[in-house]
């Protein structure tokens, strides 16, 4: 039963990590866009950093769940 739970959690964390990656990339594009205002660019840069932290967190959790599902 734990193997099934770990597998489901692995999939969920991989999806959340991928979502954070997509958001990070979109925010990086906004931060680099010279047509945007300085405030918008700074907010996007901060959001990209937050997304990177979230991405790393979910990837680490997914790896832990993967290990739990295979052992």
UniProtKB/Swiss-Prot annotation:
Inducing or repressing factors: Grg-1 message levels were found to increase within minutes following the onset of glucose deprivation and rise 50 fold during the first 90 minutes of derepression.
Superkingdom assignment: Eukaryota
Region described as Disordered: 19-71
Biased composition (Basic and acidic residues): 49-71
Cited Pfam families: Grg1 (PF11034)
Signal peptide annotation: none
InterPro entries: Glc-repressible_Grg1
Protein name: Glucose-repressible gene protein
Lineage of the species this protein comes from: Eukaryota, Fungi, Dikarya, Ascomycota, Pezizomycotina
